[in-house]
């Protein structure tokens, strides 16, 4: 677990998110408290539960991004779900426990990737030896293709290797021109020499683009269409997993490049080296101790919401959420997962409701509240320039791939920021996402013509911005559809 201090966490979040300091400080303290809890005695550690957070603010101000960056910073399993996708038990829709099962799948993928990286060098070494076994010609004299080991056929002619023929041992020479070696050690020595020559060619990249036929395991397995009704996806997944264990895995022959064959062999060897039971145990522990579940649109299931629905009980969804948030045990295919120490971050705009419209029991499970402010012109200007992944840097890098170099002037950025604020005020306020639509409109022609303008340098100034937004500014109704 990361032992960054709250100040360091906020500093890292500042690299990608502008403003919203109160929310950043709150999640930084929540993350630091997890580290503090791990330093305690086990008896006291189990008594300390995370303080769940509700973020309030309009769309596009950074609620989801704060939680996502926090999870990435701490290498924690993270999942974003929407409260409106869940329904009360007995209705058609996903049950709330599915979010924990999905989080466990993410945890498994996260830990498996880490374990793969640990054994990568050893797996690649083993895969290389298997690849050489496949490439090394057999003992039977055949013109071409030659039959390799492991059920792989390989054309050894020079026409597929860029003009360079793969060396073959004397055992494969034409019987009419060469006699079998009489010495007992000559054949193994020749085979070893050929193997090393193949290794040299492989390391030099001379074999990457050659094609081979290789038997691989079918990843899909038998397609069992069972219980595919809405709301029963989890049950159907478990039944399919059961059938996949009953039916033997099928293999099929595929033609692929040697580089792709090496990658498949590396993955096979990594799977053999990894202890999958240990992966499940580590993933379950990480999910239980450091998992983060981000519940978006929590305001849509509050009783004060003006959106009515006759077939879904919003209060029922809240009551189903209670045991998960408070701490319960959820059955997954990797074992039982406790939710006592998973951090829940709920978020919503709360335009037509307020946190107090949630049922009191659920309010009590989210003791911390952070209000995110709407973005203005100055915030938009900072978003365009300060973050490491600023939109201007993204568009500049994208067009550079076509050989077009663009430069945004300061007055152009101020013009874009002012127009974003104006459009958000006159239409729907979508926060920083407005910058995407404006920049796409400004650079639409340039992006289309970029392949024909390689080597050009384009300066985007305020006049350029006003020219490309003139039609939208002149027609306010048009701006509602385009921006």
Swiss-Prot record:
Compartments, as annotated in UniProt: Cytoplasm
Pfam families named in the record: AAA, AAA_2
Residues the record lists as binding ATP: 18, 60-65, 296, 361, 433
Compositionally biased region (Low complexity): 136-147, 171-181
Gene Ontology BP term (one): proteolysis involved in protein catabolic process
Bias kind Polar residues: ranges: 182-191
GO cellular component: HslUV protease complex
InterPro entries per record: AAA+_ATPase, ATP-dep_Clp_protease_ClpX, ATPase_AAA_core, Clp_ATPase_C, HslU, P-loop_NTPase
Chief location: cytoplasm
Region (Disordered): 136-212
Record key words, sorted: ATP-binding, Chaperone, Cytoplasm, Nucleotide-binding, Stress response
SUPFAM superfamilies, alphabetized: P-loop containing nucleoside triphosphate hydrolases (SSF52540)
Function: ATPase subunit of a proteasome-like degradation complex; this subunit has chaperone activity. The binding of ATP and its subsequent hydrolysis by HslU are essential for unfolding of protein substrates subsequently hydrolyzed by HslV. HslU recognizes the N-terminal part of its protein substrates and unfolds these before they are guided to HslV for hydrolysis.
NCBIfam families noted in UniProt: hslU, PRK05201.1
Family: Belongs to the ClpX chaperone family. HslU subfamily.
Self-association and partners: A double ring-shaped homohexamer of HslV is capped on each side by a ring-shaped HslU homohexamer. The assembly of the HslU/HslV complex is dependent on binding of ATP.
Protein name: ATP-dependent protease ATPase subunit HslU
Taxonomic source organism: Nitratidesulfovibrio vulgaris (strain DSM 19637 / Miyazaki F)
Gene coding for it: hslU
């Amino acid at each position: 677990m990361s032992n960054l201090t709250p100040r360091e966490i906020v500093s890292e979040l500042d690299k990608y998110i502008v403003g919203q300091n109160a929310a950043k400080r709150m999640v930084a303290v929540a993350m630091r408290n997890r580290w503090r809890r791990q330093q305690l005695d086990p008896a006291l550690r189990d008594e300390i539960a995370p303080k769940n957070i509700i973020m309030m603010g309009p769309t596009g101000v950074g609620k989801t991004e704060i939680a996502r960056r926090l999870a990435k910073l701490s290498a924690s399993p993270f999942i974003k779900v929407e409260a409106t996708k869940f329904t009360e038990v007995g209705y058609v829709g996903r049950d709330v426990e599915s979010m924990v099962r999905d989080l466990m799948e993410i945890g498994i993928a996260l830990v498996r990737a880490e374990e793969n990286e640990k054994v990568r060098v050893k797996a690649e070494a083993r895969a290389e030896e298997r690849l050489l076994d496949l490439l090394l010609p057999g003992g039977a004299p055949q013109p071409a293709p030659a039959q390799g080991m492991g059920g792989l056929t390989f054309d050894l002619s020079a026409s597929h290797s860029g003009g360079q023929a793969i060396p073959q041992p004397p055992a494969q020479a034409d019987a009419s021109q060469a006699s079998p070696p009489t010495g007992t050690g000559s054949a193994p020595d020749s085979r070893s020499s050929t193997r090393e020559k193949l290794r040299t060619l492989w390391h030099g990249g001379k074999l990457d683009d050659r094609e081979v036929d290789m038997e691989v395991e079918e990843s899909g397995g038998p397609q069992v269409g069972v219980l595919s009704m809405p709301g029963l996806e989890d049950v159907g997944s478990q039944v399919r997993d059961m059938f996949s264990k009953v039916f033997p895995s099928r293999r099929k022959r595929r033609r692929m490049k040697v580089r792709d064959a090496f990658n498949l062999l590396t993955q096979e060897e990594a799977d053999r080296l990894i202890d999958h039971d240990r992966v499940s145990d580590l993933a379950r522990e990480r999910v239980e101790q450091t998992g983060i579940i981000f519940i978006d649109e929590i305001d849509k299931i509050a009783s004060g919401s003006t959106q009515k629905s006759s077939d879904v009980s919003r209060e029922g969804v809240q009551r189903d959420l209670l045991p998960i948030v408070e701490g319960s045990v959820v059955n997954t295919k990797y074992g039982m997962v406790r939710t006592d120490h998973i951090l829940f971050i709920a978020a919503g705009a709360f335009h037509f409701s307020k946190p107090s419209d949630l049922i009191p029991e659920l309010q009590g499970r989210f003791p911390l509240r952070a209000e995110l402010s709407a973005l203005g012109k100055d915030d938009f200007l900072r978003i365009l320039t300060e973050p490491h992944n600023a939109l201007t840097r993204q568009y500049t890098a994208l067009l550079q791939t076509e050989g077009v170099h663009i430069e945004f002037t300061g007055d152009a950025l101020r013009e874009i920021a002012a127009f974003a604020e104006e459009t958000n005020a006159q239409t729907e306020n979508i926060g920083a996402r407005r910058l995407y639509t404006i920049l796409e409109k400004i650079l639409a022609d340039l992006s289309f013509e970029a392949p024909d303008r390689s080597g050009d340098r384009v300066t985007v100034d305020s006049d350029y911005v006003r020219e490309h937004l003139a039609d939208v500014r002149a027609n306010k109704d048009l701006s509602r559809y385009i921006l």
